[in-house]
Amino acid sequence: MPKINGNEIRPGNVLEHNGGLWAAVKVDHVKPGKGGAFAQVELRNLRNGSKLNERFRSADKVERVRLEQKDQQFLYESDGMLVFMDAETYEQIELPADLLGERRPFLQDGMTILVEFYESEALNATLPQKVTCKIVETEPVVKGQTAANSFKPAVLDNGVKVMVPPFVGQDEMIVVNTETMEYSERA
């Protein structure tokens, strides 16, 4: 595994640090008036989700880990485990449902997601950035309601509540950004 200097750490890098695998969530490069430059890094443990703030000097060396990325197709859920199939090898794997966190409701049958592996252990799963959902409940459209930046609550077919523009009505299909969990556009 390649070693990188502390000032080369970027958000999204996976590092081996203190015997664990950590993802750099936020990186601030600081150059104080006195003393050497350093990187203040917010790390998230890929195995248990705990967070850690660490300071790396420019001269510090850290192990950067490359994760293998594979597309996996969602098949079904069983006993809190999500079952996926590798599209190339047709091999099935089970992942804990909490691996997707609050984005779990956006997972749909047959959806292809990106799973990151380290030495055949699944560490992270990423949904597509945009997903199409149906609005099952929202307030009716009121004509003449054109106040700037006004949004109304809506409940999607997966139970998630999002804010939508006033012109969007019930039973309409919309596109939701899975990273921000916000309305993106009409489908």
Curated annotation (Swiss-Prot):
Main location: cytoplasm
SUPFAM superfamilies per the UniProt record, alphabetical: Nucleic acid-binding proteins, Translation proteins SH3-like domain
GO biological process: peptide biosynthetic process
UniProt key word Cytoplasm: yes
InterPro entries, A to Z: Elong-fact-P_C, NA-bd_OB-fold, Rib_uL2_dom2, Transl_elong_fac_P/YeiP, Transl_elong_KOW-like, Transl_elong_P/YeiP_cen, Transl_elong_P/YeiP_CS, Transl_elongation_fac_P
Cellular location(s): Cytoplasm
Gene3D superfamilies: 2.30.30.30, Nucleic acid-binding proteins (2.40.50.140)
Pathway terms, separated by semicolons: Protein biosynthesis; polypeptide chain elongation
Keywords, alphabetical: Cytoplasm, Elongation factor, Protein biosynthesis
Gene Ontology CC annotations of this record: cytoplasm
GO molecular function annotation: translation elongation factor activity
Pfam families documented for this protein: EFP, EFP_N, Elong-fact-P_C
Function description: Involved in peptide bond synthesis. Stimulates efficient translation and peptide-bond synthesis on native or reconstituted 70S ribosomes in vitro. Probably functions indirectly by altering the affinity of the ribosome for aminoacyl-tRNA, thus increasing their reactivity as acceptors for peptidyl transferase.
Family: Belongs to the elongation factor P family.
HAMAP family linked to this entry: EF_P
Name this protein carries in UniProt: Elongation factor P
Organism (species): Ruegeria pomeroyi (strain ATCC 700808 / DSM 15171 / DSS-3) (Silicibacter pomeroyi)
